[in-house]
């Protein structure tokens, strides 16, 4: 596989996402709203633990205020109270299902915008980046977005339900294997044996969920581009993988690498801000810097996600492109 063959779809996906930056911001706002909604039952459960069980709130929430760690801490504290634990888990389940459904519906509108941009942008990836080309690829509009949400809503909800079920089954299998490994190793080999088992299972889980999320994105792209059912989208995705295996795997490898680099940069930035917080007076600037880092991190991950979607879309629904001789304002090739 030649490098340009892989460069062009990735560049096209990046330019389509950049030209339609409002949907990137919209996806970020939707995800942030979902996380805020998810924090409500967790914070409520924390105060329930603090009041009913007389436990320290900071110990339950954890030092890093991570939602997953906080939810685990609350659930652990409520183990001795089945009714309270059931209510807490039910509240989280309601928020997860409702918030996820909201995200699934919005994703239909977002991909409808990207598909429309794909079909009107022309071969913009073959030319230097110009503002005129980005304007031509910008297809963000309320009508296109709402039409996409209405047209794809039912199918995206069905596909999303399958995704949530996959997450649930994968999580239960992970916990089962880790607990079984802990019991099999025993106290003598706890430090080494159980740690190795847990690390291996965690790595396998991350790899598996990465493949699941990639397949989920490709199915969404196919459904948005061809307006087909979930089953037909799965057939089309498999056909695309057989026909264009090298570039599909190449796009997957590049996008996963970019996400990994962005995650590493985020961790380093967070650690750096943590060190700054100990400096007198200078530490006062940490909060706005943390908010800025959170904003940039969220926008970057949403942008990478839509870049990946645009790259897969360019492989599946190749642009017809305007004639090379055609041009737009400023002498830029169309």
State each model region's role:
Residues 1-334:
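Hydrophobic alpha-helical membrane segments
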């Amino acid at each position: 596989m030649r490098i340009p063959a892989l460069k062009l779809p990735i560049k096209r996906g990046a330019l389509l996402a950049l030209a339609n930056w409002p949907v990137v911001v919209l996806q970020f706002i939707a995800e942030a709203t979902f996380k805020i909604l998810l924090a409500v039952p967790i914070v409520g459960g924390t105060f329930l633990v603090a009041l009913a069980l007389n436990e320290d709130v900071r110990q339950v929430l954890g030092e890093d205020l991570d939602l997953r760690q906080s939810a685990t801490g609350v659930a652990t504290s409520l183990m001795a109270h089945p009714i309270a634990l059931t209510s807490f888990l039910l509240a989280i389940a309601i928020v997860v299902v409702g918030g996820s459904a909201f995200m699934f519906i919005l994703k239909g509108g977002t991909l409808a915008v990207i598909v429309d941009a794909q079909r009107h942008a022309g071969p913009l990836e073959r030319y230097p980046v110009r503002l005129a080309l980005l304007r031509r690829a910008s297809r963000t509009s309320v009508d296109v977005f709402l039409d996409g949400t209405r047209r794809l809503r039912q199918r995206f909800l069905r596909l999303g339900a399958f995704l949530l079920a996959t997450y649930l089954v994968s999580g239960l299998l992970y916990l089962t294997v880790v607990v079984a490994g802990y019991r099999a190793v025993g106290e003598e080999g706890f430090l080494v044996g159980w740690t190795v088992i847990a690390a291996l299972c965690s790595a396998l889980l991350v790899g598996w969920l990465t493949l699941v999320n990639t397949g989920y994105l490709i199915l969404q792209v196919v459904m948005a581009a061809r307006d087909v059912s979930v089953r037909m989208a799965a057939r089309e995705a498999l056909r695309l993988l057989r026909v264009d295996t090298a570039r599909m795997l190449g796009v997957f490898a590049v996008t996963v690498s970019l996400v990994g680099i962005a995650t590493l940069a985020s961790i380093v930035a967070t650690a750096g801000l943590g060190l700054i917080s100990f400096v007198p007076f200078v530490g006062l600037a940490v909060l706005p810097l943390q908010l800025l880092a959170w904003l940039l991190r969220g926008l970057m991950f949403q942008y990478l996600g839509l870049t990946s979607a645009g790259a897969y879309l360019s492989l599946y629904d190749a642009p017809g492109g305007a004639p090379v001789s055609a041009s737009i304002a400023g002498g830029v090739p169309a």
